[in-house]
Amino acid sequence: MSDPAADRDILKAKLNQETAKANWKELQPFFARGQTVYVAPELDLIEVALAFSEDQADILSLWRDKGQVDKVADAQAGQWFEADQALWTVVVMPWVLVQPVQVQ
């Protein structure tokens, strides 16, 4: 019998290892297919990826209602293209979750 908490920790570690930086221009094919999902900077990208993986509809709906998680809009994509925006990315098939890299 598997331990749900241990399974979640393993999935979280896997998602963390699969997180990478990419420039927006590299992600254009995914955007063109409607597969890029914006994650607001105040959210933890890995926690959002876990919510997608575990189909946590309630929390995803809450974030969507707050504008914190949503498909990347055309206007945002244009701004990121012009700025050659760097983004943190993680794939949760079929989605590519993206979060702007914060300059400190």
For each feature predicted by the language model, list its residue ranges.
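Alpha-helix boundary recognition
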Residues: 31, 64, 81-82
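Generic secondary-structure microfeatures
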Residues: 41-43, 64-68, 94-96
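Short, compact, well-ordered microdomains
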Residues: 70-104
